[in-house]
A protein has these predicted regions:
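Long, low-complexity serine/threonine/glycine- and acidic-rich segments characteristic of extracellular
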Residues: 47-52, 59-189
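Conserved, short, structured surface segments that act as functional micro-motifs
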Residues: 1-58
């Protein structure tokens, strides 16, 4: 925020003194904003990954529209399963708003499971100040640049700090054998 005097911006944080972990003041109940609007998942993308002679390569994203049910859960607008390669990851395009506020907010948590087994969880919560420069490592920039929403990669990049990921199996990569059908669930908070 900009200081009323026109001076430098002010930034406030609450941290655990001993560990220097940042408190999420909303989830900790320190601040209770008027907010009963859940985050909205706009689209889901799937990207297949592989290596060619030791060099990482990835496919173009396959994009899927979603629709929200009356109960608040989402499903793809298509009925047939998503065609997936032997390994890949999901990217979630989502937005969060709060009551009475026009601008959007980022998600603070995203989770992925496959066949009921947790594979990935990202939390924008509890990291130390020195790691705050790494908190955007989950953004999938090729889509983020043209989206009005937050675009989160449900996979850990090679140099991304582990503190952002309380759940991580195979760096979030979903593996699928030929002919295998897997059921994936994605949650956004």
């Amino acid at each position: 925020t900009r200081a009323p005097s026109g001076g430098p911006p002010l930034h406030y944080e609450l941290r655990d003194t001993r560990t220097q972990r940042l408190y999420n003041v909303v989830s900790a109940g320190i601040i209770r904003p008027d907010d009963d609007l859940p985050p909205r998942i706009m689209r889901i993308h799937y990207i297949e990954v592989d290596t060619v002679q030791g060099i990482p390569v990835h496919s173009r994203p396959e994009s899927y529209a979603v629709v929200r049910s009356a109960g608040g859960s989402y499903r793809l607008t298509r009925e047939e399963p998503v065609g997936a390669g032997r390994k890949g990851y999901f990217v979630v395009e989502a937005s969060d708003r709060r009551n009475g506020v026009g601008n959007t907010f980022g998600l603070w948590r995203l989770a992925l499971s496959a066949d009921g087994k947790p594979l990935f969880e990202y939390r924008m919560d509890g990291f130390e100040q020195a790691q705050s420069r790494c908190c955007d490592a989950v953004s999938y920039y090729p889509l983020q640049l043209t989206s009005r929403n937050e675009v989160i990669r449900a996979a850990q990049l090679a140099q991304s700090p582990a503190c952002f990921y309380p759940v991580m199996e195979e760096r979030g990569i979903v593996r699928t054998e030929a002919g295998q059908t897997r059921r994936s669930r994605i949650g956004a908070w």
